Amino acid sequence: MRVLSADWVLPVAGAPIERGAVAFENGRIADVGPASELGEGERFADSVIVPGLVNAHTHLEYAVYSGFGDGQPFGPWLTTHIERKARIGAEEFLAIARLGAAECLGSGVTTIADASFSGAAAVAASELGLRGIVAIEVFGLEAGRADDARRRIAELEPVLDSRVRLGVSPHAPYSVSTELYRAAYELGVPVVTHLAESEDEVDYLRDGSGPISAVSEIAPSGLTPVRHLAAHGLLGPQVLAAHCVKVDEEEIALLAEHDVAVAHCPRSNAMLGCGFAPLAALRAAGLRIGLGTDSPASTPSFDLFEEMRAAVLAARGREEKPDALAGWEALELATLGAARALHLEDEIGSLGSGKRADLTVVSLAGSPYLPWEDPAAAVVFGGSPDRVLLTLVDGEERYRKGGFEWHELRRSAAAARARLLHRKPTRPSVEPVAPRT
C-alpha cells in the first residue's frame, strides 16, 4: 500500500479534505481521507492532490505546430495545416506525438481524447503511459474510407497498452460525407468529431460560400452543422463533439436530446477568432462537457491549467457575470466532467475507493494563494505545468518533477518540426507506426 498526503486533497466528487491523504495499491485507490487516519506516507508540503487531469480534445501529432498560420482566419489556417502535414511521414508523426504525450504527463494530464491522423498518438500514449481514447481520423466522400480506419485499428491494437482505446474520428461535417460518417459510426467504437467550430463552417454547409470551399468536396446541405448531422441520424451518446461554438438554443437541445458529449476548447476558439462556446447554455441543458486544449496548431500548449483559466474568463466575459463559472467548476470540467464526456467516470475523474489511481500533485509553494483560502481556486488560478510535482497513472509514476527530462524525445520532435518548416510537400505515410522496443 502506498500513501501520498498533502495540505489538501480535492476528490472533486466530494468535499475537500484538509491535510488529506490518498492510499492506493494494485493500480486502484484504496481510501481517501485525513492523513491522521491513513498516514502521511510521502508528504507534499504546500501542495494539493487532485484527480489526474483529463484532456477532452487533443492532437498529439501537432505538438510542434506552434505558430504555424498564426493570425490567419479559420479557412486559410486550415489550408496551411493541410499543406504542412503533407511534408512528413510516419516516424516523424510518432516523434511529435511522443513529445505531445510527454507534455501532457508533465502538465498533470493522465487521460486524453485524441484525434489522430496517422495513429501515432495511440502508440505514443501507450509508450509513455497515458490513458485515453485515440480516434483515427477519416476524411472524404467514400464510405469505404471507414474500412481504412478499421484496418488501422486492427493493426494498432496488438501493440497498445490496455489503457489506450481506439476510436474513429470523422473530421468534420465540411470534410466528411454523411455516408462516411455513417460507415464510421457502424464500426462500433468511440467517435470524435469537430462540430460547429467556426462561422466559415456554418457558411460552407449553408450555401457553399467562404474559404472552406477551396478545400472541401462535400456538397453543402443548406443546414447548420448540428442540424446537418441530426437530419441524417448522426448524433448519439458515442459522439464526442469538439468545439460547438456556433450553436443556438435549438441545436443545444438537439445535442442534449441525443446525449452528445462536448469538448470545450476556449483557448483554441479564441486564438482562431471563432468566438466562445455558450458554456452556460450547454451546462444548463445537462450536456456532458469536458475541457480540451486542442493542439499547439491552434493554441499555445497542452496546458489544462491555462485552459481552466480561459474557460473561467470566457464564461464570465460572455455572460457578464462574475459567478458564471467558479474555479471549482472549471476543475470539475478538467476532471470528472471530462471523464463523463469519455464515458470513463466510473474509473477516473475523481478520487474515491475503487477508482483508478490516476493522481496529480500540484505545488502552490511561493504563490500568492498561500496561506490557503480556497484550494480549488488556488489550483485553477495558480497552477501550471511548472508546479506539477507528480503524475500517476494506475498508481505508476509517469512524471516526477526533476526526474523525467525526455531529452532525446525533444530532440527528435525538434528535428521533425524543422522538416515541417523546410521540406517540400510529399504524400504523407500513414503506414502503422511501431512502438520503440
Predicted regions: what they are:
Residues 1-20, 25-26, 35, 332-437:
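Active-site microenvironment of metallo-dependent hydrolases
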Residues 35-50:
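Active-site metal-binding motif and surrounding structural segment of the metallo-beta-lactamase
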Residues 38, 123, 149-261, 273-289, ...:
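Histidine/acidic residue-rich metal-binding segments in metalloenzymes
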Residues 48, 66-129, 151-161, 415-419:
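Alpha-helical scaffold segments that flank or form the walls of functional sites
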Residues 52-63, 190-199:
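Histidine-centered catalytic micro-motifs
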Residues 59, 117-118, 137-141, 169-175, ...:
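Active-site beta-loop-alpha junctions enriched in small/polar residues
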Residues 64-95, 102-105, 128-129, 133-142, ...:
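Active-site gating loops and adjacent loop-to-helix segments of metal-dependent hydrolytic enzymes
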Residues 231-235, 277-366, 382-385, 392:
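His/Asp/Glu-enriched, well-ordered alpha-helical/loop segment
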